[in-house]
Amino acid sequence: DKTLPIYLGVLPRNGKGEDIRWFKAPNQNACHVINAFNVGTKIHFDIPVSKGNGLWFFPDVDGSPFSPPDAMAFPTRWTVDYASKSDEFESVKKLSDMGGEFPRIDDRHLSREHRFAWWLVIDLSKPFTASAGRGMNALGYMDYQTGRQTSWWAGEQYHMQEPCFVPRTPTSPEGDGYIVVVVDNVVTNLSQLVILDAQSVDKGPIARIKVPFRLR
């Protein structure tokens, strides 16, 4: 229902039900989460957000058809202030023009402020094999500190599955490691396990493990 606002519930980690705060913002759609952390009483939620319904199997209450352009999600930061007397979001800030989903960070920084993020990108500027459709054909990278953003395109016959970050060593600095992602070839119906340097995804894979069947 596009006429209704969205609501975000915030409950202190050791709080009780009566401690929950509900914040609202104009209608938008969100699904997967990059990360969330607080700085003092302000809580930041980094999340891919789309203008309209991102899930075609949920019908619109007014019968409107599914709109692919409105379903494109972009990394966005929602900020609320738990100490505020207002029930409105403090801010909604778009973080990148690379639209996509299935984000990932260095999991060692979950619930703490993070510097790097990776996500699957739908790169509409690249060619695609008709049978593949407009799938998630690229891997995006963002450095929050420097503002650097880049991506790796898998190729016109490929779709990607959800990525995973692997630290180079248990004590490596944040973001020092590898992105591991399954890439599906829609023509051969086979998969590859692709490994990229997490800080240089634009340089392409450093290894490919070819699987003699399609995963999933």
For each feature predicted by the language model, list its residue ranges:
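Beta-propeller domains
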Residues: D1-R216
